[in-house]
C-alpha cells in the first residue's frame, strides 16, 4: 500500500452509525449513503449488513498485529509475515478504516468474510448497484497487482456517487483511476 498517512495525521472523521443492527459507523456522508443503499437492497429482498466501518488506531493496530502473528505461527519469518499480512490487512497507518470510508459489507444470509461471498445474490447486487450509492469494490480480484491486496468481495469504499460511477465505468482500481486522473 502506498497510501500511508504520517503517524501525526490521524484522521478525525465526523462519524454516524450506518447500521443500527451492528452499530458500525462510517463517515457521516458515507453512513447516509450506506443507509440508502441498504434500503434499496432491502427492496430487492437483500439484507445488507455492515460488519465493519470506522476503526480507531488501537483497533487497526490490533487487526494488523493479529494478521502478522497468524503468518508467524504458520512458519513465516518476521519479515515475510509482515509482507504477507500487508496483503490482507493494511498497516494501521494505511488502513481506510481510519477515514470512515472503508466498509465491510456482507448479507444476513452470508456472514462469512471469504471469497465465497462473491457467489451470493448480495454481492451481485452490490456489483450492479453500489456505485449508484457512491461505493466501489475496493480490492477487485482482477486488479490485485495494482492494489497490492488480495480480493475481498466484502470490502467496499465510499468515494461519492460521481466518482464511483466513473471508477466502475473505467474498470480500474482506485489506485489506477487516481493515477490516470493525475496525468490529465
Predicted regions and their residues:
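Extracytoplasmic cell-surface/polysaccharide-interacting catalytic and binding patches
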Residues: 1-184
Amino acid at each position: 500500500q502506498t497510501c500511508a498517512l504520517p503517524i501525526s495525521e490521524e484522521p478525525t472523521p465526523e462519524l454516524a452509525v450506518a447500521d443500527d443492527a451492528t452499530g458500525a459507523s462510517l463517515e457521516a456522508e458515507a453512513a447516509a449513503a450506506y443507509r440508502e443503499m441498504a434500503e434499496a437492497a432491502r427492496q430487492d429482498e437483500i439484507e445488507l449488513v455492515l460488519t465493519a466501518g470506522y476503526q480507531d488506531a488501537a483497533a487497526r493496530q490490533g487487526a494488523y498485529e493479529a494478521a502478522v502473528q497468524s503468518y508467524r505461527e504458520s512458519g513465516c519469518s518476521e519479515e515475510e509475515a509482515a509482507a504477507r499480512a500487508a496483503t490482507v490487512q493494511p498497516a494501521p497507518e494505511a488502513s481506510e478504516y481510519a477515514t470512515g470510508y472503508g466498509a465491510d459489507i456482507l448479507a444476513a444470509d452470508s456472514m462469512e468474510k471469504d471469497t465465497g461471498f462473491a457467489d451470493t445474490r448480495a454481492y451481485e447486487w452490490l456489483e450492479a448497484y453500489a456505485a449508484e450509492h457512491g461505493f466501489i469494490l475496493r480490492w477487485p480480484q482482477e486488479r490485485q497487482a495494482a492494489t497490492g491486496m488480495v480480493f475481498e468481495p466484502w470490502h467496499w469504499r465510499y468515494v461519492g456517487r460521481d466518482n464511483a460511477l466513473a471508477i466502475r465505468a473505467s474498470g480500474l482500481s482506485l489506485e489506477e483511476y487516481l493515477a490516470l486522473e493525475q496525468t490529465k
